[in-house]
């Protein structure tokens, strides 16, 4: 009896030890517990019910897809999981649900009657920066409308999105429209395939600063260069569409490029106004705050249509390049990440259906995880609205990440120059958050100078109010959060700040898809490769012998990309300080580091062997906040004017 019990106990212990090894999930993946799973189920059923009521039929596709077939459908870059099957085919765990449905329709439903209305609920995985807190697996609730083009298809797609948001009871949402067509028309006039590829990659990466640098290096004419540079910066209401068409004319394009967007908004307004529904949406907290008297946006800057629930932003370039026209992102719950994305992809089925050269198609997908977060945020907002004091506290100031260290003085000078109160930043003590305000309502001017003064004259009339004397709208209250420059991108990406400042290097290393808007022209330094002067040639000999270089750096992503671009194999050793010691003590062959004056290199007897890039401070924003809160763009415009003065003066 005792022996049998001992054997059972031994087996139980072995099973427990096995479970101990499985007690955590891989990074970027997590378990869903019953309470959350039930909430997700209810959301999924509600959304699926909306899709089903409009005749959308369910389909399912495999989790694994042949990579070559997906590549033929569009640009696929964020596929973290790849494997070979027994036949030697390269398979991927799908990062997208639209392309598998394109494959399904192309192979199994070619003879189906059009239009096809399909829906799905399916998980997918996408690459994310390690230790960023971002999930690598999420579930999409989506639909595809195949065979219905033009205004009718666009209106059906967007209307179904609106109905789904209403069915979920979301009281605060925003739909932001863009279009791929204007940008592609401009690129078609470049006549330079390499330039077009580089420009498209930079816009996909939200890097508008390097976009300007690349355009300046090109030989295209000034009107076209200006149009390409300005287009992804355009945002707002109908006036943004007017400016798109103006830029097109300047670039030699006579046909208006915004007709589809104008028609879409007009039909949506007619449909929902006629139905007596309105949008069912109140402007989100940022929009509501921006609409308060005295400190607000002009009518041209405020969101328009469906009670402020619609706007345009031509920086929207969805991550997959199969889109051909309308693209859109949906925000809800005043959260910075979109709860859904979609658009039109009219070329995906070219030649697929008999006797039809082109079959239009459009689709949209909600993120179940983000919808659940938005629903929770909306419920919290409704509960808080019952308490007036709590509701007032929820009107948050614009939050700006201010770096410590070498960029601190330049950042304070820039913020002061554009009219913000920086007195608390000069000696913050141990405070991590500094409360401040925009001083524009307290001065009579508005013309920005490099030195931080404001010039101008008071409007006529002794009784003119402060708001009447403003050269532009006030940003209102702000909060400065004091962070390390290397941490600023994480705070902005994670919603801890709306915007911030850091070096170009920190943005590259973080790789969080933030929107880079302004080169601030301070904090200049160079990225260099260096080695000990007394061992000149040793690194080359070691490379010839080993086939790789050993390199110490604090910037592994930048260093790896540079060596890869030169076809050099390099083993990167990541250090966090005293990088120069790597080759001095014989741990590495060379270093990759920053230098401003070269003093540290000389003092440690290091000589430069390569130049990687130049680096300056940049103003960057959370893309969602830039689309939801016009104060972010207002600050960016002021900073751009200030930086332009600095750039002109060298």
What are these regions, as identified by a protein language model?
Residues 294, 388-650:
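Domain-level signature for soluble enzymes in the chorismate/prephenate branch of the shikimate pathway
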Residues 3-17, 273-304, 378-393, 437-475:
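Intrinsically disordered, low-complexity terminal tails and inter-domain linkers enriched
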Residues 61-78, 178-188, 316-324, 580-581, ...:
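Beta-rich nucleic-acid/ligand-interaction surfaces
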Residues 61-68, 116-127, 174-185, 509:
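Short, glycine/charge-rich beta-strand/loop segments that flank catalytic centers
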Residues 79-87, 192-212:
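Acidic, His- and aromatic-enriched active-site or binding-groove loops in soluble protein domains
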Residues 18-36:
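Auxiliary tRNA-acceptor-end handling modules of aminoacyl-tRNA synthetases
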Residues 59-91, 134, 527:
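Polyanion/phosphate-binding surface patch
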Residues 36-54, 65-68, 76, 98-111, ...:
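Positively charged, Gly/Ser-enriched RNA/tRNA-binding surfaces
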């Amino acid at each position: 009896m005792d022996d049998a019990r001992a054997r059972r106990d031994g087996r139980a212990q072995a099973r427990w030890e096995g479970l101990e090894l499985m007690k955590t999930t891989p990074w970027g993946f997590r378990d869903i517990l019953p309470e959350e799973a039930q909430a997700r189920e209810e959301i999924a059923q509600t959304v699926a019910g909306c899709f089903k009521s409009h005749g959308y039929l369910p389909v399912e596709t495999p989790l694994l897809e042949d990579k070559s077939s997906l590549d033929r459908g569009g640009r696929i870059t964020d596929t973290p999981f790849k494997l070979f099957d027994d036949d030697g085919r390269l398979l991927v765990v799908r990062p997208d649900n639209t392309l598998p449905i394109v494959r399904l329709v192309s192979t199994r439903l070619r003879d189906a009657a059009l239009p096809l209305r399909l829906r799905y609920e399916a998980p997918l995985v996408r690459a994310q920066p390690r230790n960023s807190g971002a999930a690598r697996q999420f579930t999409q609730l989506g639909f595809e409308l195949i065979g219905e083009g033009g205004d009718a298809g666009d209106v059906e797609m967007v209307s179904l999105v609106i109905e789904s948001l209403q069915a979920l009871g979301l009281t605060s949402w925003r739909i932001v429209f863009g279009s791929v067509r204007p940008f592609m028309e401009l690129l078609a006039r470049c006549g330079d395939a390499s330039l077009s590829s580089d420009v498209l990659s930079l816009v996909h990466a939200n890097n508008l600063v390097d976009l300007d640098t690349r355009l300046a290096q090109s030989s295209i004419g000034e009107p076209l260069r200006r149009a390409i540079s300005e287009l992804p910066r355009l945002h707002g209401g109908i006036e943004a569409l007017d400016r798109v068409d103006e830029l097109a004319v300047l670039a030699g394009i006579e046909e208006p490029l915004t007709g589809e967007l104008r028609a879409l908004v007009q039909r949506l307004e007619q449909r929902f106004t006629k139905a007596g529904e309105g949008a069912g949406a109140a402007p989100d907290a940022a929009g509501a705050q921006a609409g308060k008297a005295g400190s607000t946006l002009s009518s041209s800057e405020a969101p328009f249509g469906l009670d402020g629930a619609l706007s345009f932003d031509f920086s929207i370039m969805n991550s997959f390049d199969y889109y051909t026209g309308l693209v859109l992102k949906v925000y809800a719950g005043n959260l910075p990440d979109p709860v859904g994305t979609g658009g039109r992809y009219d070329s995906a089925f070219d030649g697929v259906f008999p006797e039809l050269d082109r079959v239009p198609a459009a689709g949209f997908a909600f993120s179940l995880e983000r919808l659940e977060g938005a629903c929770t945020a909306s419920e919290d907002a409704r509960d808080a609205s019952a308490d007036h004091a709590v509701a007032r506290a929820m009107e948050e100031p614009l939050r700006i990440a201010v770096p410590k260290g070498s960029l601190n003085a330049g950042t304070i000078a820039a913020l002061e120059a554009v009219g913000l109160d920086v007195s608390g930043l000069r000696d913050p003590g141990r405070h991590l958050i500094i409360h401040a305000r925009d001083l524009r309502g307290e001065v009579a001017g508005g013309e920005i100078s490099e030195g931080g003064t404001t010039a101008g004259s008071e409007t006529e009339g002794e009784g003119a109010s402060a708001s009447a004397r403003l050269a532009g709208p006030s940003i209102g209250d702000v909060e400065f959060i004091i962070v390390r420059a290397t941490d600023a991108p994480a705070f902005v990406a994670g919603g801890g700040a709306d915007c911030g400042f850091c070096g170009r290097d920190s943005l590259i290393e973080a790789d969080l898809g933030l929107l880079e808007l302004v080169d601030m022209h301070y904090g200049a330094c160079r990225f260099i490769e260096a080695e000990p002067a007394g061992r000149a040639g040793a690194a080359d000999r070691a490379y010839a012998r080993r086939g790789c270089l050993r390199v110490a750096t604090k910037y592994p992503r930048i260093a790896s990309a540079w060596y890869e671009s030169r076809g050099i194999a390099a083993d990167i050793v990541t250090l966090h300080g005293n990088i120069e010691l790597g080759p001095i003590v014989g741990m590495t062959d060379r270093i990759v580091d920053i230098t401003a004056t070269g003093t540290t290199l000389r003092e440690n007897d290091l000589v430069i062997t390569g130049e990687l890039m130049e680096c300056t401070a940049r103003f960057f924003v959370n893309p969602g906040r830039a689309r939801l809160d016009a104060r972010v763009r207002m600050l960016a415009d002021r900073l751009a004017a200030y930086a332009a003065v600095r750039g002109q003066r060298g």
